[in-house]
């Protein structure tokens, strides 16, 4: 019996077919098959959040910044309504710091020398302003070009800001100032002499000054008013980070900004065509586009004569290629973008601070009256504007104290070893900051005090590495001489022809960040003759 029992055959298991790995896979598959759609969604979301968090920590490495990122969106809500104090805290956190908003990793360089390194490293970084900027300004806009293509544009544009050229822009600027100063007084009278915000009118006068300088009388007053009213929509669209694809959603800031930009581009192209037709008749240049088109015509005639075999042909001072109406439009649109908010900010603070500092305004007034030999209605010209040391000091101190450009976003086109210990990842934004260098107490003692004399009796003029108002490197501002002279013309004329009183509020010194810096209360003033 025992032997029979022992001889009964038993089923044989194929052990090789059931490894632990296969048991696990089979069990997992059965588990997944039982999952609901919500379980799949939650698992995918957790995986995405984990990946996003790990990538942030890896990109951050050793630089300052939050230890962890708010899942996916990062500080997006704060970016929609930026606080200036938050920027100060970020800059103070370290020479390099970072944030990550949605998919975009952003590195801020607050150290002066690191800012210079970014500005002067075109092989590693290119200007991007914000990710959506190319859609608004134009993908082929010259500010985004590098190397030979950028140099070609710059060579053609630089002569537009020589003394000879700038002298021809001033009569139109004088007329714009006279027109808008009357509007300032009328606006105060219409408000029964009560204070009102003037930031809006300051934006309008600066838009008019820019457009008349760019296009002279080729652009109508209605178009000037329309662009001045609408251009803030283009600025509002250029937030540091936008919701993906929002440019295609009607009613969003990027959608409205794109439509505004397209309309301005079309108007500028029309003005360029009108200019070419007018200059072909032999007219004298009176605005930027006139000078640019004249240089094209001179270059074309030169090339034609050389090609015809003429010898001893005099070469023009600025030999350039023919630029299309669209190229002219895109270029002058970038000029307007660069100038509109920056000049509006500078003008707003200048009028507010001078009203608060009657001692400064009195000295500025005396200097401008003396330069006009006692005739306060004498039009300004270039030699006059270049002979106003105190007015120049006031302008420079204003640009340092309340810089109209606080940083300039760049895009890392390849891994950028910005320090020996940190490399900015490719496709990250790297933002050199200008404000910290301009408020460095080692370069400018008591940097929060508005003190024009630091440019006369102090050594502020020697702090050239800290003077980042107009950037540095191959993409620095072409108008670094034009801007202070234009501001001097406007404020000198205002000082002699107007009185204005600032009515401070609890928010007058609170800084609003809208592309640049503005007083939070809009600058409450009353103007009179």
From Swiss-Prot:
Positions that bind heme: 477
Highest taxon, organism lineage: Eukaryota
Membrane-spanning ranges: 38-58
Cofactor(s) needed: heme
Pathway: Secondary metabolite biosynthesis; terpenoid biosynthesis
Membrane topology annotation: Single-pass membrane protein
Gene Ontology biological process terms, A to Z: sterol metabolic process; terpenoid biosynthetic process
GO molecular function, one term: iron ion binding
EC number per UniProt: 1.-.-.-
Keyword terms: Heme, Iron, Membrane, Metal-binding, Monooxygenase, Oxidoreductase, Transmembrane, Transmembrane helix
Subcellular location: Membrane
Ranges in coiled-coil conformation: none
Main localization (coarse): membrane
Any Gene Ontology CC annotation: membrane
Role noted for this protein: Cytochrome P450 monooxygenase; part of the gene cluster that mediates the biosynthesis of the sesterterpenes ophiobolins, fungal phytotoxins with potential anti-cancer activities. The first step of the pathway is performed by the sesterterpene synthase oblA that possesses both prenyl transferase and terpene cyclase activity, converting isopentenyl diphosphate and dimethylallyl diphosphate into geranylfarnesyl diphosphate (GFPP) and further converting GFPP into ophiobolin F, respectively. Other sesterterpenoids (C(25) terpenoids) are found as minor products of oblA.
Family of the protein in this entry: Belongs to the cytochrome P450 family.
Name under which the protein is recorded: Cytochrome P450 monooxygenase oblE
Gene name tied to this protein: oblE
């Amino acid at each position: 019996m025992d032997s029979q029992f022992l001889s009964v055959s038993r089923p044989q298991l194929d052990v090789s077919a059931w490894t632990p790995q296969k048991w696990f896979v089979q069990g997992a598959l059965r588990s997944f098959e039982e999952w609901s759609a919500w379980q799949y969604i939650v698992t995918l979301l957790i995986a995405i959040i984990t990946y996003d968090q790990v990538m942030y920590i890896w990109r951050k490495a050793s630089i300052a910044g939050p230890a962890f990122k708010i899942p996916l969106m990062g500080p997006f809500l704060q970016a929609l309504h930026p606080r200036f104090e938050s920027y100060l805290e970020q800059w103070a956190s370290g020479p390099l710091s970072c944030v990550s908003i949605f998919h975009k990793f952003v590195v801020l360089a607050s150290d002066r020398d690191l800012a210079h390194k970014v500005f002067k490293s075109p092989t590693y970084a290119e200007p991007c302003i914000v990710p959506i900027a190319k859609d608004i300004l134009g993908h082929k806009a010259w500010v985004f070009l590098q190397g030979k293509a950028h140099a070609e544009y710059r060579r053609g544009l630089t002569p537009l800001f020589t003394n000879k050229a700038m002298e021809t822009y001033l009569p139109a600027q004088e007329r714009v100032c006279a027109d808008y100063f009357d509007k300032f007084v009328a606006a105060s009278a219409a408000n029964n002499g009560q204070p009102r915000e003037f930031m809006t009118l300051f934006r309008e006068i600066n838009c008019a000054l820019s457009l008349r300088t760019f296009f002279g009388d080729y652009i109508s007053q209605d178009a000037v008013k329309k662009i001045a009213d609408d251009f803030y929509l283009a600025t509002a669209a250029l937030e540091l980070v936008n919701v993906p694809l929002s440019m295609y959603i009607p009613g969003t800031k990027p959608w409205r900004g794109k439509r505004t930009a397209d309309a301005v581009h079309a108007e500028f192209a029309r003005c360029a065509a009108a200019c070419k037709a007018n200059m072909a008749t032999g007219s004298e240049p009176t605005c930027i586009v006139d000078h640019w088109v004249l240089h094209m015509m001179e270059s074309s005639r030169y090339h034609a004569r050389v090609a015809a075999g003429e010898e001893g042909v005099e070469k023009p001072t600025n030999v350039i290629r023919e630029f299309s109406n669209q190229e002219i439009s895109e270029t002058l649109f970038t000029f307007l973008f660069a100038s509109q908010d920056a000049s509006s900010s500078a003008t707003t603070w200048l009028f507010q601070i001078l009203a608060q500092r009657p001692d400064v305004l009195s000295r500025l007034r005396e200097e401008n009256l003396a330069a006009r030999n006692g005739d306060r209605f004498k039009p300004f010209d270039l030699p006059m504007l270049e002979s106003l040391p105190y007015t120049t000091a006031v302008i420079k101190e204003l640009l340092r104290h309340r810089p109209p450009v606080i940083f300039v976003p760049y895009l890392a086109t390849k891994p950028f070893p910005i320090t020996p210990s940190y490399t900015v990842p490719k496709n990250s934004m790297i933002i050199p900051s200008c404000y910290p260098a301009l408020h460095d107490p080692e370069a400018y003692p008591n940097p929060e005090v508005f003190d024009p004399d630091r440019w006369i009796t102090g050594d502020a003029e020697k702090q050239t590495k800290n003077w980042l108002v107009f950037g540095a490197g191959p993409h620095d501002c072409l108008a670094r001489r034009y801007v202070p002279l234009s501001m001097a013309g406007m404020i000198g004329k205002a000082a002699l022809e107007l009185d204005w009183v600032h009515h401070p509020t609890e928010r007058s010194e609170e800084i609003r960040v809208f592309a640049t810096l503005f007083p939070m209360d809009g600058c409450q003033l009353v103007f009179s003759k």
